[in-house]
A protein has these predicted regions:
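Solvent-exposed loop/turn segments at secondary-structure junctions
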Residues: 43-46, 85, 149-151
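Short cationic amphipathic helices and targeting signals
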Residues: 36-39, 137, 141-147
Length: 173
């Protein structure tokens, strides 16, 4: 779910000081085969803002807070999202009926991205931490930057910041 409160940085409060609002410009979503963390409409007039946004991405890539208290808070957030989608969006209810047909015979056939609320309520913390370590690794992530900037400079910034991250010794492929 959303890692907006990364372990190293106070991400959400800082982003809001530059006009990047939580929910509208700073958010995340999970589909059947990817999780996307998004920072949008960040003002790039100041070089420092670009650097700070890259630091936010770096924080998300390896310093997610998986302490029990934070996990339990997110369980509540997931429940609220599930409830809102079920009561307010016919599209969500339709997808719950259509997805098993669309994905018949695949590993996605019986699982919606938001999950089963019984599992959300009862999974052991260790299971989530193990899953995170297995699949939410920097070597399985991509960074997409869109805007009016010098591409070569941006590539150098990304390589300098993210190139320091060590690869996992036993990746789960």
């Amino acid at each position: 779910h959303f890692p907006g409160k990364g372990k190293k940085l106070g991400i959400v409060p800082w982003c809001e000081t530059i006009g990047v609002k939580f929910g509208a410009n700073l958010n995340a979503y999970t589909s059947v085969d990817q999780t996307v963390y998004h920072i949008g409409s960040a003002p790039i007039k100041r070089e420092g803002i670009i650097d700070s946004c890259l630091l936010v991405l770096n924080d998300w890539s390896q310093f997610i807070n998986l302490e029990a208290k934070e996990i339990d808070k997110e369980r509540g957030v997931i429940h609220e999202e599930w409830r809102n989608r079920r009561t307010g969006m016919a599209m969500q209810r339709m997808m719950e009926n259509v997805m098993p047909k669309i994905y018949k015979g695949t590993k996605y056939e019986d699982c919606l991205p938001i999950g089963n609320m019984d599992i959300v309520d009862h999974f052991p913390y260790k299971d989530l931490r193990d899953y995170y370590q297995k699949w939410y690794r920097p070597d399985l992530q991509a960074i997409v930057v869109v805007g009016d900037f010098n591409v070569e400079q941006m590539e150098l910034k990304i390589q300098k910041l993210f190139g320091k991250i060590k690869a996992h010794k036993n990746p789960a492929e």
